[in-house]
Amino acid sequence: TIGEDDWPFPAPLLRQANGWVFDAQAGREEIVNRRIGRNELDTIQTLLAIVDAQREYASADPDRNGFHDYARRFRSSPGKKDGLFWPVAAGEANSPMGPLIAAAAREGYGKGKADSGKPAAYHGYRYRILTAQGRNAPGGAYSYLVKDRLIGGFAVVAYPVQHDSSGVMTFIVNHDGVVYQKNLGPGTEAAASNMRSYDPDASWKAVQ
């Protein structure tokens, strides 16, 4: 460790003929591994927070449409409450994802612009809401949509912005709150971007 805070320095020491040196390559790999591990743990917790937020949204019916449906988007349309987050005035109750968005803002997220056509990243991961489930999900295959409202359930996929750099595993969760993970490999972004349903077959493993 180094410094007053005993920060665990990632580069191991190597003994050479002329003395001890730091193994820079091993240090770089350890830094990446630590970042991946941290991002993946944060992502699991974020997914569980989204599940709680969706349940709160459905219970409260903030858009006053008369249905206890789930939100189809994370950020509400301007002037509406059709997503899990919307701006609030002083003294107003937070939106379901208000605390999470506030924490992200404190960390500097949301100050820049997201890549064109892609969801904004948070701790190295992007998130998408899914509106259906496949035959491998409990209850079999069906759409969560009823007359364009997300009534039958919801699901979310979270995938790394850069596979093997910002994360390795892709994660999915639905309204039951069980998070599954799978390594989709180098084609992670394409596979996750094209995912249309929550379908945890035997290749997906539940997160313990």
Q: Model features per residue range: what roles?
A:
Residues T1-P12, F154-A158:
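Exposed beta-strand-loop-beta-strand "reactive/processing" segments of non-cytosolic proteins
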Residues I2, Q16, N174:
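Acidic surface patches and DE-rich sequence motifs
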Residues D5-F9, T43-T46, A53, D164-G167:
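Stable alpha-helical elements in mature extracytoplasmic
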Residues D5-W7, G27-E30, A132-R135, V161-D164, ...:
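Solvent-exposed loop/turn segments at secondary-structure junctions
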Residues R28-S77:
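Conserved hydrophobic/amphipathic alpha-helical signal-anchor segments
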Residues Y57-S165:
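Flexible, glycine-rich surface segments
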Residues G152-Q208:
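C-terminal soluble interaction/assembly domains
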